[in-house]
Amino acid sequence: MNNNLLIIAGPTAVGKSDLSVDLAKKLNGEIISVDSMQIYKYMDIGSAKISKEEMGGVPHYLIDFVDPSKEFSVAEFKDLATEKIKDIQSRGKLPILVGGTGLYINSIICNMNFAESDKDEEYREELEKIANEHGNEYLHEMLKDIDLESYNSIHFNNRKRVIRALETYKLTGKPFSSFKAKNSIYETPYNIYYYVLNMDRAKLYDRINKRVDIMFEKGLLEEVKNLKAMGLTDDMQSMKGIGYKEVLYYLDGKISLEQCIEMIKQGSRNYAKRQLTWFRKDPRAIFIDKDTFASEEDISSKIINDIINS
């Protein structure tokens, strides 16, 4: 059994889904989504979830399976994805990771080891209180002396991750960063083919803006109203995603519809920028500038030739 793993990554709205379905059909592959928002049920429009029609008969996994009221960790994702990769490979097919959540991708290809089993709810509540009273930056500074690597790699506004890092140190006496890959971060159990799609920034931003407009045309407001009626609130993990938190602000009368739309567009553009920064840090990633190819077919052919000739 070969241990090949194809990855099609890239920023939001760059066009990963269409290419990956085409590749799956040509390479006898099955797709595992690596998108931290498409995991949730009932959240189709705001997450730009691929439709059954767009899947084109290609099996897709780890989409639409988590209740949005529940917490879901990277460690849980890694375990599920790893099992699915084994299953796909055991049937003689090629697993293809598709998405833009860099941490999800790294959890798999770097075989990251998460210390997720132990939790200290009382300490978490204490840290939440500190953050609420003094701010996220104050909480983030607490990491500096005990885990400089996590301090430098975790953004101060990622409160959940900062708290997890502080909690891990309290429980284990070891830095949270030490629970990542045991050896080099670039060592992987797979034979990977890692591609990152990109395009001219102005074109990408235009695609992002148009995608947001289409989301509203498709009924994003109604989708969030339904989620709100189900009891979902802005402090839940799922509702912190771009597109959902802003619509909640609008529905709560905190901002106008115009402000809501512009905030989603700006947030999505900023997210795309962060995604590209993340992918550029990995020397294994091969960037594909879509503007230099005449067609999607040419991109597909290039990737297939790389795999065949490797």
Swiss-Prot record:
Domain of life: Bacteria
Enzyme kind, highest EC tier: transferase
GO BP term (any one): tRNA modification
Catalyzed reactions: adenosine(37) in tRNA + dimethylallyl diphosphate = N(6)-dimethylallyladenosine(37) in tRNA + diphosphate
Sites marked Interaction with substrate tRNA: T101, R124
Keyword Nucleotide-binding: yes
UniProt key word Transferase: yes
Cofactor: Mg(2+)
EC number of this enzyme: 2.5.1.75
Keywords for this protein: ATP-binding, Magnesium, Nucleotide-binding, Transferase, tRNA processing
Region (Interaction with substrate tRNA): 35-38
Binding site for substrate: T12, A13, V14, G15, K16, S17
UniProt-annotated binding residues for ATP: G10, P11, T12, A13, V14, G15, K16, S17
Binding partners and assembly: Monomer.
Family designation: Belongs to the IPP transferase family.
Protein name according to UniProt: tRNA dimethylallyltransferase
Originating species: Clostridium perfringens (strain ATCC 13124 / DSM 756 / JCM 1290 / NCIMB 6125 / NCTC 8237 / Type A)
Lineage: Bacteria, Bacillati, Bacillota, Clostridia, Eubacteriales
